C-alpha cells in the first residue's frame, strides 16, 4: 500500500525534524526515499500505468476515474449545482463516496464550497500547530505534530489526486470520506490532541523589554 507508506514516511520525517531540527540528518534518508520511489515506479508495470494515466487521462483506460472527477469539478462552476444534486455520483464516478468525495463537493457546492472545505482544514491545522507550540512537554508537542502532519498530508494527497495534480492513489479525505476505520483512527488522534491541549502552558503576554528587543 504505497499511499499509506507515503503518509507514514511524511509523519516520520516531520516528527524527526521537529525533534531534532538539523537538515543534515534528513538529507540522506530523503535522497534514499526518492531513489527508491523512482525505482519502484520504473520497475513495476502497474505503477508505470498509473503515471501514464496521470499524464494522459483522456487516452488511458486507467484514467476513467480521473476524467470523471474532472468532469464533476468542471460542472460545479462557482457555486455548484446544489447540495445533493450531483450527477457524477450516480454511478459515473467510481468511489464517489470515498476517495473522490472532494470532486462531488466541487460539483454540488462549486468552487466556493471547495474553498470553504479547504479553509476549514487550514484552520484545523493552524490550531493543531498552536497546540503543539504551547504543549507542556516535548512528547505532547511531537504527538500533536504527528496528528497535524497526518491530516495535512492526507488532505493534500486526496485533493491532489481528485484534481489530477498527482497520480491516482487511494487516500481518503480526513473526516469526510466514507470509511469507519479511517474516521475511528482520526477520532483517537483528536483525543490525544485534546488531552495535550488540556495541559497547555498558560499564555504569557510579552513584557515591555521583550517587545523592545524584538523591535
Residues of each region from the PLM?
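Hydrophobic alpha-helical segments of membrane proteins
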Residues: 2, 6, 80, 114-119, ...
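Hydrophobic, glycine- and aromatic-enriched re-entrant/interface helices and adjoining loop segments
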Residues: 25-116, 135-143
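Membrane-proximal intracellular helices of multi-pass ion channels
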Residues: 115, 126-128, 132-140, 145, ...
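Structural signal for the C-terminal ends of transmembrane alpha-helices
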Residues: 13-22, 122-132, 193-201
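Alpha-helical transmembrane segments of multipass membrane proteins
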Residues: 11, 35-36, 40, 153, ...
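A juxtamembrane structural motif centered on a specific transmembrane helix
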Residues: 157-215
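Loop-to-helix entry and N-terminal half of a specific, functionally important transmembrane alpha helix
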Residues: 132-170, 176
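Hydrophobic alpha-helical segments of polytopic membrane proteins
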Residues: 2-42
